[in-house]
């Protein structure tokens, strides 16, 4: 009631549209590829040959209207993006170092690169490389490989790959080139730093525990001194009055008593002497015949004792 029915004819239309979108997206995903570098760092001694390699992963579009260009150039490491700057390798421009499909482009003959100690190679597995012969420290830098897919002379996809070449001068630098990944070296460095931090922490743990123990001892000693001082202050108060406390419900409020005060006074005795004298007052001298104990009258003899 009140809900319009959806026409059945719209369902096939939506299904056809979704199927077309899915096929277009899947076709784009299948046609996508990327460029990778097996090694990101090459270390070569001076005078050796350095071969830098890039690799295309994924299916590449095929057809008469599709052209794949692969080229090499020098660049620098940027803060945001690498391989943005284009510089020629040994005075060779970008057009001179281009591949066309799996073969070299027609305008880049083998004689021109070889005259400058360069050699380009490519295979059917997506690998393409450049070889620098008799390298010198001037050849050190960041090398980039660029792959461009053109359809009807319009660029469709553009991918980069980068690697660094370090040329070591001197006779003791070795005899062969070494290739490695910077990620591996970074992971090794991170593991070494973590291990060193653990060792330092274990060595510093006893010192930290000792400092904590000393601090607790000082705190306990200070607390004991405060308790002793409070106790001595409490004992120094003589005859304090009762503290007023709030009365409980149903009980009369206790009245506070004033502190007791007592003044010593002298009280005369029967003999005329003072039983209690003020401080620093000598006792009165005894009278003649007075002794401490009162004299007793003699007891008369009983008649019974005389008869005996």
UniProtKB/Swiss-Prot annotation:
Annotated Gene Ontology cellular component terms: external side of plasma membrane; plasma membrane
Q: Where is the signal peptide, in residue numbers?
A: 1-32
Name of the protein this chain belongs to? V-type immunoglobulin domain-containing suppressor of T-cell activation
Q: What is this protein's gene name?
A: Vsir
* Cited function: Immunoregulatory receptor which inhibits the T-cell response. May promote differentiation of embryonic stem cells, by inhibiting BMP4 signaling. May stimulate MMP14-mediated MMP2 activation.
Q: What are the Phosphoserine sites (modified residues) in this protein?
A: 232
Q: Which residues form the Ig-like V-type domain?
A: 33-167
Indicate which residues are glycosylated according to the record. Answer: 49, 91, 127
Organism placement in taxonomy: Eukaryota, Metazoa, Chordata, Craniata, Vertebrata
